[in-house]
Structures are given as C-alpha cells and as structure tokens.
Amino acid sequence: MWKFIKSATDQNNWLEHDQNEIVFWGRSNVGKSSLINALASQKIAKTSSTPGRTRLINYFETQRKKIIVDLPGYGFASMSKKAQSKISGIIDFYFRNSKNSKNICILIDAKIGFSYIDLEMIDYLKSLGLLFDIIITKIDKANQSQKHRVKQQALTFSDDINIFMVSSEKKQGLSDLVEHFEL
C-alpha cells in the first residue's frame, strides 16, 4: 500500500532518507497528482482542475518502499510572480542540492505536446547534468495524430531516455511504469 509521507516547503524539511527518488515534474495541470493516485490505486495525492495547486514538495512511499516526489508544476498561470519565484527557487535548490539520486520524470500532456516552457525545463535539467525520462500523460484524451506527434518529439531528445505513454483515468501504461521503476 502506498502512503503519503510529508510535504516540504523548503530544504529545512525535506524528507531525510537514503533511497533513490522518483521525481514527477511537469507543467501545472499535466496530471502529476492524478498519476500518483492511479499508480497507488487510491487517492493519496490532492488533485485539482485548477492549475498550480501543488505548491509544496510532496513525498510518497510505494508498497515496495520506493520514494516518489511530486514537485510543484511549472508554468503556473494563476499565481503571483512572487509565489512563482518562490516555488522556482525551491525546485532549483532541490535539484542542485538534494543528496539523493533521482529518476526525474518529465510529464507531458499528449494533447498539448512539448511547449516552449517544457523545452526550457528540459534544457535546465541538461545544464545541471541530470538525466530524465518522459511520461506522456492523458493519452486517452488525445487523438492518434496528437499521440504520434508528441512521441516523435520525445524521441528527438536522446536514445538513453525512456518514454512512457499513460492514462491515469483509463489505467493505460501504468504497468510499464511499475515494472520499470519497480514500484
């Protein structure tokens, strides 16, 4: 059984542990929390139709004792510049200073594809020397052409990244994530 462990506002209350972290990050409203709930088969992460609701670093533990980190989304439209700046600073500090090794998963909405800000965040991760995988979400809401386009975009990044296509709502592709990350 998965469980919520804690929320952290900054490095002073990060979860202290010695495990690899599986980090979910993407644009606001891309489905990070919904994906966690679908993988857990229970509602342990708060979801909202309003973008930018996750403003803390949230830690979860899988039944196999893996640590999942739900980061606040980027591209928050309904948030003040001050709040955006604070969250960006927390995330930057986390990526630069957290001692735990990380499997970073960039989540991309299948209908929207890679936006300019997604590409900026990928460049940012590369500039830090961090590796990442791509999880294409909401595939049940995209048509065949949109799914093909976003997958082709994802394939341009590198041969070493894993690409997953999932639907939290229809439970599609979840077993691939469970198997790959040993959740």
Swiss-Prot record:
Identify the species of origin.
Answer: Metamycoplasma arthritidis (strain 158L3-1) (Mycoplasma arthritidis)
The role this protein plays is:
Necessary for normal cell division and for the maintenance of normal septation.
Q: What is the protein name for this chain?
A: Probable GTP-binding protein EngB
Q: Where is the EngB-type G domain?
A: 18-183
Domain of life, source organism: Bacteria
Which family would the database say this protein is a member of? Belongs to the TRAFAC class TrmE-Era-EngA-EngB-Septin-like GTPase superfamily. EngB GTPase family.
> Which InterPro entries does the UniProt entry name for this protein?
G_ENGB_dom, GTP-bd, GTP-bd_ribosome_bio_YsxC, P-loop_NTPase
Biological process terms from the Gene Ontology for this record are:
division septum assembly
Q: Write the gene name.
A: engB
| Cofactor section | Mg(2+)
GO MF terms here are:
GTP binding; metal ion binding
Binding site residues for GTP = 26-33, 52-56, 70-73, 137-140, 166-168
Residues that bind Mg(2+), according to the entry? S33, T54
Keywords, sorted A to Z: Cell cycle, Cell division, GTP-binding, Magnesium, Metal-binding, Nucleotide-binding, Septation
